[in-house]
């Protein structure tokens, strides 16, 4: 079990939290993290591209000329693929690029990222994170007091915190159940509350 310092929103010490080694203390598996990111990005692809094959192109129902006797090559339709304006062969059609990944692998991926954050000292735990009103300036001040520079991922269910971060290019706020591998990898610092740590450990431990 690893102990990590807990801070308040002003950057002052507020005690310690014991992190579960089954979640925050495993050996990071980079291959599984990579596969999880590829799967996540594949699920975001639109897959709406479409071309017309010879049956979908307008026209071409009549045989251009008779089968024999003209000296020209036999043709059955002016919309065959070899014709200008003809249909496309094996072109893209609407499809879903999403695919499944075993639950154990998905959980191993997020646990690997969380463990790596702890190893790199990029994990910050707060006693609580609440805002009375959406104030971007207050959120920036809090991040400065926590020495959270660069790209920061905040895990919080507080709506005011989410609204306060909308205008900050390098800050993203996600709910506890929205924590994902791609965001955790793309953002340097990860800020959790003690409640968020408990919920994450309940699901992943």
UniProtKB/Swiss-Prot annotation:
Going by the UniProt record, its keywords in alphabetical order are: Ribonucleoprotein, Ribosomal protein, RNA-binding, rRNA-binding
NCBIfam families linked to this entry: rplD_bact
Q: Where is this region: Disordered?
A: 43-97
Classification via SUPFAM superfamilies:
Ribosomal protein L4
> Which domain of life does the protein's organism represent?
Bacteria
Give one GO biological process term.
translation
According to its UniProt entry, the function of this protein is described as:
One of the primary rRNA binding proteins, this protein initially binds near the 5'-end of the 23S rRNA. It is important during the early stages of 50S assembly. It makes multiple contacts with different domains of the 23S rRNA in the assembled 50S subunit and ribosome. Forms part of the polypeptide exit tunnel.
Family, per the entry?
Answer: Belongs to the universal ribosomal protein uL4 family.
Stored InterPro entries: Ribosomal_uL4, Ribosomal_uL4-like, Ribosomal_uL4_dom_sf
Q: Which organism is it from?
A: Lactobacillus acidophilus (strain ATCC 700396 / NCK56 / N2 / NCFM)
Q: Know the name of this protein?
A: Large ribosomal subunit protein uL4
**Pfam families with a match to the protein in the record:** Ribosomal_L4
UniProt feature, compositional bias: Basic residues: 51-71
Subunit description:
Part of the 50S ribosomal subunit.
Sorted alphabetically, the Gene Ontology cellular component annotations on this record are: ribonucleoprotein complex; ribosome
Q: What are the recorded GO MF terms, alphabetically? A: rRNA binding; structural constituent of ribosome
